[in-house]
A protein has these predicted regions:
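Domain-level signature for soluble enzymes in the chorismate/prephenate branch of the shikimate pathway
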Residues: 1-357
Length: 357
């Protein structure tokens, strides 16, 4: 009886799938035409502001029952596949594969890209600066561990610009080759992951040795080769390295997130929900920082982040990294930045880009 009820529903799904197949290929054909026009004008293949607008429209017009984030993931992969018909972009990231950095690449670009895993954040910057990759994805801050200082230092020095950002929830899982903790003698992970799971590990596996390694991807590789080792990593690593998850979501902070920035030579246009990152320094005098930031309040520009870093001059000078709402070309933001520049001892716009939800 149940088969009699399921048969017409399955036939309906098959018919809808056939329509989807036709529509997806029609979309791809139009995307190819877009690619031809871009090639004539030497326009960039990847336009983060355009893709951000598409994803925002998907969420706004979604009638359900599918969740908007799930639909956005589907549309991101559709755009990625269509973009690859124009040109498959190369994206450098902090490797190896199976890390949260690779997951951030997929969240920004989809999976239809050429990946370039790098051994360090410095190498990611060098790869993009040399033209080996069009874009790079690097971590800039974690909600529990704080700022990635090396990324800030390199953003100050580079000629590249920030063209996007990714806010990635960090969900750590404990995984092994066998799917069991039987016979496990050590738990491997990046030092930050071990710190972020410390309370959980103390409660559940207080006597097992913990070993810090270069990355969670490296930990997963170790667990693949050594049956006596477990790894802490993301779900992607388990899939990449053929491991089984023993315990999921073991991080102490359920709201743990890492923010990544996309670096490249592309300067995105405004999409309507933008953020601008700047770095500046001030003369060493009383009230200098307060006076410097006054133009933001004057022009009604909201500051969302303020971070200081030593300037390494030996004179107790500091660089201030500031994120503000809006695009650098927005009239009010443009006026505020112009005033900031006249007052600052050093001033640099790191980039304007679509703000990640």
């Amino acid at each position: 009886m149940s088969d009699d009820k399921l048969k017409p529903l399955r036939e309906q799904i098959d018919a809808l799938d056939a329509q989807l197949l036709i529509l997806l290929n029609e979309r791809a054909k139009v995307a190819q035409q877009v690619g031809h026009v871009k090639a004539e004008t030497n326009a960039p293949v990847f336009r983060p502001e355009r893709e951000a607008q598409v994803l925002a429209r998907v969420a706004k017009n979604n009638p359900g029952p599918l969740h908007s984030t799930d639909l956005q993931s589907i549309f991101r992969e559709v755009m990625s596949a269509c973009r690859a018909l124009e040109n498959r972009v190369t994206v450098a990231f902090l490797g190896p594969v199976g890390t949260y950095s690779e997951q951030a690449v997929w969240q920004q670009f989809g999976q239809a890209v050429t990946e370039l895993p790098c051994i360090s954040i410095d190498e990611v910057f060098r790869s993009v600066e040399a033209g080996t990759a069009e874009f790079g994805v690097v971590p800039v801050e974690n909600s529990t561990e704080g700022t990635i200082n090396r990324t800030l230092d390199l953003l100050l020095q580079t000629t590249l610009t920030i063209s996007g950002e990714v806010a990635l929830p960090v969900h750590h899982s404990l995984m092994t080759r066998t799917g069991s903790m039987q016979g496990i003698k050590r738990i491997c992970a990046h030092s930050q992951a071990l710190a972020q799971c410390q309370s959980w590990l103390n409660e559940h596996y207080p006597t097992i040795e913990r070993q810090a390694v270069a990355s969670n991807g490296e930990a997963a590789k170790i667990a693949t080769d050594d049956h006596s080792a477990a790894a802490i990593a993301g779900e992607m690593a388990a899939k990449r390295y053929g491991l089984s998850i023993v315990h999921a979501h073991i991080q102490d902070d359920p709201h743990n997130r890492t923010r990544f920035v996309v670096i490249g030579r592309l300067i995105p246009s405004a999409c309507g929900k933008d953020q601008t990152s700047i770095v500046l320094s001030v003369p060493n005098k009383p009230g200098a920082v307060y006076e410097l930031l006054a133009p933001l309040a004057k022009h009604g520009v909201s500051m969302t982040r303020f971070e200081s870093r030593p300037a390494r001059t030996g004179r107790w000078d500091y660089y201030f990294y500031v994120d503000i709402q809006g695009h650098a070309n927005d009239p009010t933001v443009s006026k505020a930045l112009a005033e900031l520049q006249t007052q600052a001892a050093f001033f640099k716009v790191l980039g304007s880009y679509p703000h990640a939800s």
